[in-house]
């Protein structure tokens, strides 16, 4: 009886937290096997589901455990039911059915797939901002056209969408070498269509794309505003693949509902499967990315240097990669192996505008000017009191410290009484958002800036 209550409570919590599609996939498909000695054994039909349960649902297991058992329950995940002795044979048969779509068609040479071999799931750094998208991509790699079709992933530039598309394709080809896979940016798809149309070779074009097992289209927003004939051809290609249960994965810089200039019937089809977003990596994920990008370069990137870099670039991965390239160039010229904060700062200054303003404005000067403007002392700013005027002054000072200096997030936090770097990020995002909405605050901050400079 308690086990049933416990599991029902978990499902209730999960339903409140997850979207409908994520709840159906991650929660409904899971099964509680037993609770014994404060350990809940939970069956998950797919191994990639464990990451989501660990990152997003583990805490609700703890809460439900205290509610029902008055004890802390620890989850243990299994991927084969104890009584299931034929799962491997079933899986093998399923895979044969899934992937052996076109036995009479010749497989596509890897060089013609458009895939980049370097992009795999193994070297994709996972974090809170991409966990759902990664899980969905892994699910697609395991069950083509059965899990999510289409899978639509959107997010800003440099967040890993292209990496994930290639990882899906490479994973499929690793397991099923004869699968017909094609990765192509939407702009290239459009140009390919127009070339075949001009040459009168549309049958060849249709055969190329409609015989695929997996179509990976990058930056589908490029299709917006294109002529009716172009959108019509993509619509027909989409339908032909979907009707034959072939997998389609799309990426975009915005969600389907925000794709302007596209026929409504296309937008509707983009939402048939699952839509997932990727958001900028958090501080810890940026450090992990930096570690991954620098470990084989032959240089010693000190830990405080990585933290400094992670604090400087918080919008996308490409900025981090660009900074690493600049740093290694300086290191080669100077013939040094140890990468210190000073070397990193030298490289970053060359990448940022208003160089003259960088590293010359002390944080305490910012605190002083902000404090004078709002009638708040530096001591109050560094403290933890939550009075409205103090909170505003503190957040404005953190925002300006981020905008006007070259200091890392941890360094800024330290200058505000040892605040965590996440507090600085929150302050920066909050004030930046308020500036867009509140002209008075924008003018106040501009006035403070003039006094600081």
Curated annotation (Swiss-Prot):
Keywords: ATP-binding, Cytoplasm, DNA replication, DNA-binding, Lipid-binding, Nucleotide-binding. GO terms for molecular function: ATP binding; ATP hydrolysis activity; DNA replication origin binding; lipid binding. Residues 74-113 are annotated as: Domain II. Gene3D superfamilies: 1.10.1750.10, 1.10.8.60, P-loop containing nucleotide triphosphate hydrolases (3.40.50.300). Residues 1-74 are annotated as: Domain I, interacts with DnaA modulators. Residues 332-453 are annotated as: Domain IV, binds dsDNA. GO terms for biological process: DNA replication initiation; regulation of DNA replication. ATP binds at residues 158, 160-162. Residues 114-331 are annotated as: Domain III, AAA+ region. It is found in: Cytoplasm. One of its GO terms (cellular component) is cytoplasm. The keyword Manganese does not apply. InterPro entries: AAA+_ATPase, Chromosome_initiator_DnaA, Chromosome_initiator_DnaA-like, Chromosome_initiator_DnaA_CS, DnaA_C, DnaA_dom, P-loop_NTPase, Trp_repressor/repl_initiator. Oligomerizes as a right-handed, spiral filament on DNA at oriC. Belongs to the DnaA family. Plays an essential role in the initiation and regulation of chromosomal replication. ATP-DnaA binds to the origin of replication (oriC) to initiate formation of the DNA replication initiation complex once per cell cycle. Binds the DnaA box (a 9 base pair repeat at the origin) and separates the double-stranded (ds)DNA. Forms a right-handed helical filament on oriC DNA; dsDNA binds to the exterior of the filament while single-stranded (ss)DNA is stabiized in the filament's interior. Domain I is involved in oligomerization and binding regulators, domain II is flexibile and of varying length in different bacteria, domain III forms the AAA+ region, while domain IV binds dsDNA. This is Chromosomal replication initiator protein DnaA. The gene is dnaA.
């Amino acid at each position: 009886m308690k086990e049933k209550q416990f599991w029902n409570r978990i499902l209730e919590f999960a339903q409140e937290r997850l979207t409908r599609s994520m709840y159906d996939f991650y929660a409904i498909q899971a099964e509680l096997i037993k609770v014994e000695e404060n350990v809940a054994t939970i069956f998950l039909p797919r191994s990639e589901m464990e990451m989501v349960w660990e990152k997003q649902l583990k805490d609700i297991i703890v809460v439900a455990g205290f509610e029902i058992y008055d004890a802390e329950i620890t989850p243990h995940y299994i991927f084969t039911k104890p009584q299931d002795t034929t799962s491997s044979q079933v899986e093998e048969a399923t895979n044969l059915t899934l992937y052996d779509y076109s036995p009479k068609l010749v497989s596509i040479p890897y060089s013609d797939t458009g895939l980049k071999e370097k992009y795999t799931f193994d070297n994709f750094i996972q974090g809170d901002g991409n966990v759902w998208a990664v899980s969905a991509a892994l699910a697609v790699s395991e069950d083509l056209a059965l899990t999510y079709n289409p899978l639509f992933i959107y997010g800003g530039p440099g967040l890993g969408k292209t990496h994930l598309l290639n990882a899906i394709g490479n994973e499929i080809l690793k397991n099923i070498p004869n699968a017909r896979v094609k990765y192509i940016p939407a702009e290239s798809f459009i140009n390919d269509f127009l070339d075949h149309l001009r040459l009168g070779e549309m049958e060849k074009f249709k055969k190329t794309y409609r015989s695929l097992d997996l179509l990976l289209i990058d930056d589908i927003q490029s299709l917006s505003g294109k002529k009716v004939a172009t959108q019509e051809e993509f619509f027909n290609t989409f339908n032909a693949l979907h009707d034959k249960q072939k997998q389609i994965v799309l990426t975009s810089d915005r969600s389907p509902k925000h794709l302007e200039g596209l026929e409504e019937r296309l937008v509707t089809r983009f939402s048939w499967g699952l839509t997932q977003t990727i958001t900028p990596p958090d501080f810890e994920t940026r450090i992990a990315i930096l570690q991954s990008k620098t470990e084989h370069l032959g240089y010693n990137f000190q830990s405080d240097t990585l933290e400094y870099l992670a604090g400087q670039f918080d919008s996308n991965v490409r900025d981090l990669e660009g900074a690493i390239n600049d740093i290694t160039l300086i290191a080669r010229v100077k013939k040094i192996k140890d990468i210190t904060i000073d070397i990193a700062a030298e490289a970053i200054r060359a990448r940022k505008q208003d160089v003259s303003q960088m590293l010359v404005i002390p944080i305490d000067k910012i605190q002083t000017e902000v404090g004078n403007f709002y009638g708040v002392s530096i001591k109050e700013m560094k403290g933890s009191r939550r009075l409205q005027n103090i909170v505003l002054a503190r957040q404005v000072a953190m925002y300006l410290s981020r905008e006007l200096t070259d200091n890392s997030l941890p360094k800024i936090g330290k200058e505000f009484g040892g605040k965590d770097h996440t507090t600085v990020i929150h302050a920066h995002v909050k004030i930046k958002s308020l500036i867009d909405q509140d002209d008075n605050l924008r003018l106040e901050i501009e006035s403070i800036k003039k006094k600081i400079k």
